[in-house]
């Protein structure tokens, strides 16, 4: 009986270790086991990739690019919806049930709909600061693993040019919201990427705009990735 219990214990240990290995990746170059990284993307239509294929959206292109550069990343978890403002993103995160302290990378891009609806900049600042703290909580309190992206200028798109709104006014308002999110991001000690100038290239390059004439194309998102990926690599490697 005692001998049988020893054998059973050994089998259980081996089974557990086998299960653990399934959730890891073996790096043959260093002969070590590497845990894949978990990535959470928070935002609005610019995060889900409205009007482009899922593999073309910003989170998936970023994950693929980082994988090519040596990181191993699980498929991104995206909490975002077209039209969301800061307050709606906060509610969406709460309703999503996504657990805190489980992510190695968090990106945040939010605010265009606050600007589009003419909402208060003071309210935006308050809610954006709250979202920054939520993002920090998701990364096990590792501030260097939070990456904030500036709001692109939708006024530079064909839809923006034909919307009946003055594109110059749109640009000034977008810049004002970006001043706020940059100030709060840097004050919190987080990473900030300014992709807004690249978004304005859509004025002369329509391949940067999706078929709906408003949202970024996969090519535009690739440009954002080129801006953000080096920051992620520097902070995670």
Residue ranges, per PLM feature:
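A generic secondary-structure micro-motif detector
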Residues: 2, 52, 170-171
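Sec-dependent signal peptide recognition
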Residues: 2-8
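C-terminal motif of bacterial Sec signal peptides marking the signal peptidase cleavage site
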Residues: 12-15
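Bacterial signal peptide processing site
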Residues: 17-19
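Serine-esterase "nucleophile elbow" of acetyl-processing enzymes
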Residues: 22-82, 94-101
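Short acidic active-site motifs
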Residues: 88
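Alpha-helical cap/lid subdomain in secreted, periplasmic
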Residues: 91-237
